[in-house]
Amino acid sequence: MMSSGFSVFRAGVALVLMCSFYKSTEDSLPELTPQQYFSTLQPGKASLVYFCQVGSLSNSVFLEELKEAVKPLQDYGISVAKVTCVEEEASRYCGEEEGLMKAYLFRGNILLREFPTDILFDVNAIIAHVLFALLFNEVKYITTLEDLHSIENSLKGKSNMIFSYVEAIGTPEHRAVMEAAFVYGTSYQFALTTEIALLENIGSESIEHAHLYFFHCKLVLDLTEHCRRTLMEQPLTTLNIHVFVKTMNAPLLMEVAEDPQQVSTVHLQLGLPLVFIISQRATQEADRRTAEWVAWHLLGKAGVLLLLRDSMDVNIPQHANVAFRRAEKDVPVEFLVLNDVELIISHVKNNMHIEEIQEDEGEDMEGPDLAVEDDEVAGTVYRDRKKPLPLELSVELTEETFNTTVMTSDSIVLFYATWHAVSMAFLQSYIDVAIKLKGRSTILLTRINCADWSDICTKQNVTAFPVVKLYKEGESPVSYAGMLATKDLLKFIQLNKISCPVNIASIQEAEKYLRGELYKDLPSSASVSVLGLFSPAMASAKELFREAGKQLRGSVITGIYSEDDVWILSNKYATTLPALLLARPKEGRIESVPLDTTLVQDMAQILANALLEAFPEITVENLPTYLRFQRPLLLLFSGGSINPQYRNTILALVRQKQLDSFTPCWLNLKNTPVGRGILKAYFGRLPPLPQLLLVNLHSGGQVYAFPSSQSVTEQSLVLWLKHLQAGLENPITVLSAQEWKPPLPAFDFLNMMDAPTSQAPTKKVLECQKEAEVQESAELQPGDRSTARREPVEMLRIKRWNTANWPKDTQEPFHHDKEL
């Protein structure tokens, strides 16, 4: 499991940060010149260098956190220093402005990793990132359930695994896991994820916080069998993980025949209680099976032993079948009569003793999540930053090439900013589109980084990111307003290949258009085609239709027919001119809508509304579209495809105008699993399906359920809706009127920038002065530092020292922000 790379790491790791010249009362970081630093490099030693000119005052907050990390990292054999450039220095690092915001981890003269200093936001993040980089073979980062199963299968019959979920890289929990991996990486395979969906897939009920599982794969010999899992229920701290892993190493069940008060096991040493299942020879095998069941359910919480009554002189009450011994000294053994194994489990859980040292460790858990990347998009972008993208498939524009390109060729332009997380996430989808269109499209895919060319973006009225615009010669640019996904953008591009509107020349061509035969070669063609019918004399109405169609370009195919024989189509589809024909080729339906407006916006709205289905399946993508009508949702929850009876009933009432004051729709729980959570919130449990509800989101928040004892028919549904309007039915729940707000308040970056010059750093420097002599000693005797792995107890001492010396005053504003 261990690689030779880690053996090199055990020889010693040096961490040298290229940082700005910074002075405090006591600087625990060795300050080196580039020449001094490079002359001390040794094979197998790792170093991270940041060069800058003397006098630079940037990154002071980062340096304070780095000084906090010096001693813990030294205990792992990792030394920390900073290097200051001089003006005549010729090193390539000294001349890079970007270097001021990075820390570089080297081994010898080989670069291992670059760390932007903004991800090393505190001492936990520094230690977590450094150990994560060095333990890349011991800790596998996974993102999918398939990855987890693959590792699990490879370990069956060989070794066990420790699997952890943390909210983000660099958190205190991530640090704790990496510290555990440093010690136990030779004994177990570690796997780590930040994907909450993966945690949900393995059956975790509570997913609000970090989790750690022990996978018992060594016992599994059948590859089709899953490894048994044990969840660590304590918070993820270094001490708790150490205790948990130690209990996983202990025997599952021990047999003893001595006084329970005299028994000593690793559980007592770790502060955990002991449970004795009292047995006798006549029932020993059955009692052993019971004890094993209890042991599995109390694994990590208590030690379980089988106590033989027949072979000892201890006076055990005749009817007692369980003995319970607390971890505290001088507490007598408790003899109990518990005739149900569940009672044994609950008794242990209700009498768990929490050691004071755990409370001390727990201080790391009390602070708010201000240091956590609460933006999932930003977190994903950071994790994927090393994945190469074939950017050469799109043309990068500059101030010099932008106008020439968009004026001489049909172009799609992505306006983005490299500092903007959503932009960088969408860039992946944009490149995926380029891959799919390679060699098959006449439209040029381009991109421009607004972080570099802000003037161009401002002139193109780009005020938010990302923005996609289509430029065609002689036409105004068209902005893309769809989902930031490959499929939707591809559809937008392909539909824009078609004229808007399409001029239909004959009745036969019009019929082909309505059947979807004119553009069937487009894989992403729209599900609805619109044909405007006008007499030759309706010039103004035709112009309105053309303008309205241009507003919807890229989302719908529009056509226009205005020949002398247009009355044939008008009569066939029973409509008066001017009119719209809405064709849904996949469903074989053609509907007619009369046009009686003289405003472009009104006609565009008619076109947009006409695209909506009468009884749609609600998805994450289309829900906002239907919510804008501000009408109660008549919502049918289905476990799969909708029952034709329900569809026919609803559509019949729609045609009869009986549901005009509602938005009828349905939700497929297989396609949109979040529907299960919605139903549980409404009913308190998952009710039988299908379920027909009326949800009044916009006024009152009442949720009504159609009676399960009745069949859904036109008559019963209309009667039920009338009862609701008359106030004769009671809601099953009432939704809260509270606003949907972000989980955390927005960062006040100006105040955060001012803070280092006022309170927090000053207090940290004062606290650090208390350790001045210790740090001086550490710097004077670098050779005395052991580079081998520490014993767990030593590792825990480091963690506790770090917690005990954390400035208490700096935590108070954090608590206030969390309350906000």
From Swiss-Prot:
Disulfide bonds join C450-C457. It comes from the Eukaryota. The keyword Translocase does not apply. Transmembrane segments: none annotated. GO terms for cellular component: endoplasmic reticulum lumen; extracellular region. Keywords: Disulfide bond, Endoplasmic reticulum, Glycoprotein, Secreted, Signal. Glycosylated. Coiled coil: none annotated. The keyword Signal applies. Residues 394-496 form the Thioredoxin domain. Residues 1-24 form the signal peptide. It is found in: Secreted; Endoplasmic reticulum lumen. Glycans are attached at N461. Pfam families: Thioredoxin (PF00085), Thioredoxin_6 (PF13848), TXNDC16_2nd (PF24509), TXNDC16_3rd (PF24510), TXNDC16_N (PF24508). A motif (Mediates endoplasmic reticulum retention) lies at residues 817-820. Contains a masked and non-functional KDEL endoplasmic reticulum retrieval motif. This is Thioredoxin domain-containing protein 16. It comes from Mus musculus (Mouse).
